[in-house]
């Protein structure tokens, strides 16, 4: 899978702004990220922040690639209408809603038939 658009940010708000501007018009993007407790020497966002911002805008994470220079790039793309939702991501969305971070696009992507009252 080819990396067509690579985003590299230090600040979660920069990714949020990009997704707010492009969530309805782009097919995908790749975001430089890291996993673990120690931040790398280059600009990158923690994996959880990348995933949360994707969910806030109706997108999902998929492929993770290591770039030739050692950086990790996480692919994000819009969710398909009838895609499978894990309990983890549904619960993340509910938490993001409680925190006031969900957008209208993110809410529209959540499968209401999979959310029950016990999760709220």
Predicted regions: what they are:
Residues 1-120:
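Charge-dense, helix-prone N-terminal extensions
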């Amino acid at each position: 899978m080819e990396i067509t658009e690579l985003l590299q940010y230090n600040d979660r708000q920069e990714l949020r702004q990009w997704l707010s501007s492009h969530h309805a018009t782009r097919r995908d993007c790749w975001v430089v990220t890291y996993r673990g407790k120690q931040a790398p020497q280059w600009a990158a966002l923690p994996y959880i922040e990348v995933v949360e911002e994707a969910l806030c805008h109706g997108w999902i994470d998929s492929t993770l690639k290591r770039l030739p220079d050692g950086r990790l790039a996480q692919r994000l793309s819009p969710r398909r209408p009838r895609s499978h939702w894990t309990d983890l991501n549904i619960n993340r969305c509910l938490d993001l809603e409680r925190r006031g971070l969900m957008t209208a696009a993110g809410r529209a992507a959540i499968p209401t038939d999979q959310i029950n009252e016990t999760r709220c």
